[in-house]
Regions:
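Repeat-solenoid scaffold signature
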Residues: 202-241
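The feature captures the catalytic groove of carbohydrate-active enzymes
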Residues: 51-67, 99-163, 171-216
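Active-site-proximal structural scaffolding
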Residues: 20, 37, 41, 61-68, ...
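Alpha-solenoid helical repeat scaffolds
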Residues: 26, 67, 71-74, 87, ...
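Substrate-binding groove/exosite segments of carbohydrate-active enzymes
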Residues: 1-102, 106-107, 111-117
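Structural helix-adjacent loops and short alpha-helical linkers that scaffold large soluble proteins
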Residues: 32-45, 76-96, 143-166, 170, ...
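Carbohydrate-binding/catalytic loop surfaces
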Residues: 14-26, 51, 63-71, 75, ...
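Non-catalytic C-terminal accessory modules of carbohydrate-active enzymes
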Residues: 160, 228-366
Length: 366
């Protein structure tokens, strides 16, 4: 992730070298949990709005404008900079107005092409369902920001848009990406999303970008150990092939009879880099340093260390560890007041002993 934080948050340093707003949500979640309040965040958000003034969609993709709203609210909760929301007031509220005009009374949208991630792109019905859930999620966060900005009329508009969207029933069509977003947005019970979609086949059907939201859906259903097993299998599969950075795309099937990236390809084996990839990144065009795949880093801070932000700027946090089969976990969590130091150890009776040191200004609640 750090390699892609060069003044701006790029995805990725090898090829695109562009500020992709959708890619940025796993990235800013990771940056916030590892590096803290980082200037590249503000530079990237400002640049995106300058490059794509309303009524244009950010990066030419309406989904990435939805991610803009989600990212803004998420970062506000982490670091509490209301003045930055004020700086972006016109863009945030203008985007609410633009989206409102695109949603009809039956919950259908006229926002152009729908996109989640590349591996899902051939499942049109599933992508439509996931995009619909992304719209609901974005409107929920836009409503919260409208209230923070003192604009009750816009907040009401967000509620009305969400109500219209909820009138339409969508089908994930077997797509894990869609079911995960539907669980997060409250359009599907997390237990159903995991039982019928996300958990089916374990890591099969996971993707580097949307795998983060699949892990989040599993956590919502209390399936922490299962999520950690999938991290070990899927992202661990990259490590087994010699990865030292997050890859743009990955399929466990690629590892069959493939050589590692840190050695010459043995005769008779596949080149894990040159022989795979897909869509716009076949072969050596495939990026092996892509921040959108970093979701497990953020996920482990939130669910293994167990840090939940309850009040903007980390003024109040709850810490609830989920160790799975781990015997211990240790780490830090950045806040505007300094780092929270955390260590969890499993006792012989299975209970967990926690040692937590929080800076002044951060209240840890049970």
């Amino acid at each position: 992730m750090h390699l892609n934080m060069q003044e701006y948050i790029w995805d990725g340093i090898k090829r695109d070298r562009l500020v992709w707003l959708g890619d940025m949500h796993p990235e800013t979640s990771t940056i916030g949990n590892v590096f803290g309040d980082e200037e590249s965040f503000y530079a990237s958000m400002d640049l995106a709005c300058q490059q794509y003034p309303l009524p244009a969609w950010i990066n030419g993709m309406s989904a990435y404008s939805l991610w803009y709203l989600i990212i803004q609210y998420d970062w506000y909760m982490r670091f509490g900079h209301k003045e930055y929301l004020e700086k972006h007031r016109d863009y945030i509220l203008g985007l609410v107005d633009l989206i409102d005009k695109c949603i009809d009374a039956q919950g259908n949208d006229a926002m152009g092409a729908h996109f989640l991630d590349w591996p899902s792109s051939t499942n049109t019905e599933g992508v439509d369902a996931g995009y619909h859930a992304l719209l609901v999620w974005a409107m929920q966060d836009a409503q919260r920001m409208s209230i923070l900005l003192g604009d009750e009329a816009r907040a009401q508009k967000c509620r009305e848009v969400e109500d219209r969207l909820r009138r339409k029933v969508v089908n994930p069509n077997g797509l894990k990406q869609a079911a995960s977003l539907m669980a997060i947005a409250g359009l599907m019970d997390p237990a159903k999303a995991c039982r019928d979609y996300v958990s089916v086949g374990g890591p099969k059907g996971f993707s580097t970008f949307y795998g983060y939201y699949m892990l989040e859906a599993l956590a919502m259903d209390g399936r922490y150990e299962e999520a950690m097993d999938i991290i070990s299998q899927y992202w661990g599969g990259m490590l087994d092939m010699g990865a030292t950075t997050f890859w743009e795309d990955f399929d466990l099937e690629w590892t069959r009879n493939a050589g590692r990236i840190d050695d010459f390809v043995p005769e008779g084996k596949k080149d894990i880099h040159g022989d795979f990839g897909a869509y716009c990144y076949p072969g050596f065009r495939h990026s092996f340093c892509h921040g959108w795949a970093s979701g497990p880093t953020a996920w482990m801070s939130t669910h293994v260390l167990g840090v939940e932000i309850l009040e903007a700027g980390c003024k109040r946090v709850r810490i609830t560890p989920h160790l799975g089969r781990l015997q211990w976990a240790e780490g830090t969590f950045p806040t505007p007041y300094g780092q929270i130091s955390i260590r969890h150890e499993r006792r012989a009776d299975g209970s967990v002993k926690s040692s937590i040191k929080a800076p002044k200004g951060v209240k840890v609640v049970k």
